[in-house]
From Swiss-Prot:
Protein name: Ribosomal RNA large subunit methyltransferase H
CDD domains associated with the record: RlmH-like
Organism per entry: Mannheimia succiniciproducens (strain KCTC 0769BP / MBEL55E)
Family: Belongs to the RNA methyltransferase RlmH family.
Residue numbers binding S-adenosyl-L-methionine: 72, 103, 122-127
Catalytic activity: pseudouridine(1915) in 23S rRNA + S-adenosyl-L-methionine = N(3)-methylpseudouridine(1915) in 23S rRNA + S-adenosyl-L-homocysteine + H(+)
Documented EC number(s): 2.1.1.177
Length: 155
């Protein structure tokens, strides 16, 4: 199983890249964790946000292919680390790749939300999207460590 973090935005600060890659390199070879960046639509004073969201959504779903779509969205279901570890086991048993979708400044397109088999809420707070990349990578790594009795996670 491969986990793909599909996120809108390509020009992230260095700390985001460093933070994400710190966790990405820790994943085992049989469960690679990769980042796919979708270019953000051009936003401006007269931008057609609905059209931009639609284009970003199509690109995200295209990048996912046949993988299981899991959106990161405030109205999604919050998971504890133990619950995320159980989700990870369930996803592995499902046999498909996992696509974790992070939208752009206006969130996810209706098409992405409709395609989602699950929706995960990291927090009721609105978080900066660059930070979410790092938090998701760490959270999924921690869940993996729990499922394999790796010493990273401590109660």
């Amino acid at each position: 199983m491969k986990i793909q973090l599909i996120a809108v935005g390509t020009k992230m600060p260095d700390w985001v890249k460093v933070g994400f890659e710190e966790y990405q390199r820790r994943f085992p070879k049989d469960m690679p964790f990769e980042l796919i960046e979708i270019p953000a639509g051009k936003r401006g004073k007269n931008a057609d946000i609905k059209r931009i969201l639609e284009q970003e959504g199509k690109a995200m779903l295209s990048a996912c292919g046949r993988g299981k779509v899991v959106t990161l969205d405030i109205p999604g279901k919050p998971w504890t680390t133990d619950q995320l570890a159980r989700q990870l086991e369930s996803w592995k048993n499902d046999g498909r790749d996992i696509c974790l979708l992070i939208g752009g400044p206006e969130g996810l397109s209706p098409e992405c939300k409709a395609a989602a088999e699950q929706s995960w809420s990291l927090s009721p707070l609105t978080l900066p999207h660059p930070l979410v990349r790092v938090v998701v990578a760490e959270s999924v790594y921690r869940a993996w460590s729990l499922t394999t009795n790796h010493p990273y996670h401590r109660e």
